[in-house]
Amino acid sequence: MKATELREKSVEELNTELLNLLREQFNLRMQAASGQLQQTHVLKQLRRDVARVKTLLTEKAGA
């Protein structure tokens, strides 16, 4: 997910996106803990996507 795509979204859409990313991250962490996750790089990508969304939410709150 690109930051430019996220910048076009509203605060409500960003909050929804954040919730979805956190749910997906939780599910992938459970798969990794049980040894079922084959593509471990997805966890890193999700963590960075969460950080991007949180950063944009903070920027929009300050503006």
UniProtKB/Swiss-Prot annotation:
Keywords: Ribonucleoprotein, Ribosomal protein. The keyword Signal does not apply. It comes from the Bacteria. One of its GO terms (molecular function) is structural constituent of ribosome. GO terms for cellular component: cytosolic large ribosomal subunit. GO terms for biological process: translation. Transmembrane segments: none annotated. Gene3D superfamilies: 1.10.287.310. PANTHER family: 60S RIBOSOMAL PROTEIN L35/50S RIBOSOMAL PROTEIN L29, LARGE RIBOSOMAL SUBUNIT PROTEIN UL29C. HAMAP family: Ribosomal_uL29 (MF_00374). NCBIfam families: L29. Belongs to the universal ribosomal protein uL29 family. This is Large ribosomal subunit protein uL29. It comes from Erwinia tasmaniensis (strain DSM 17950 / CFBP 7177 / CIP 109463 / NCPPB 4357 / Et1/99). The gene is rpmC.
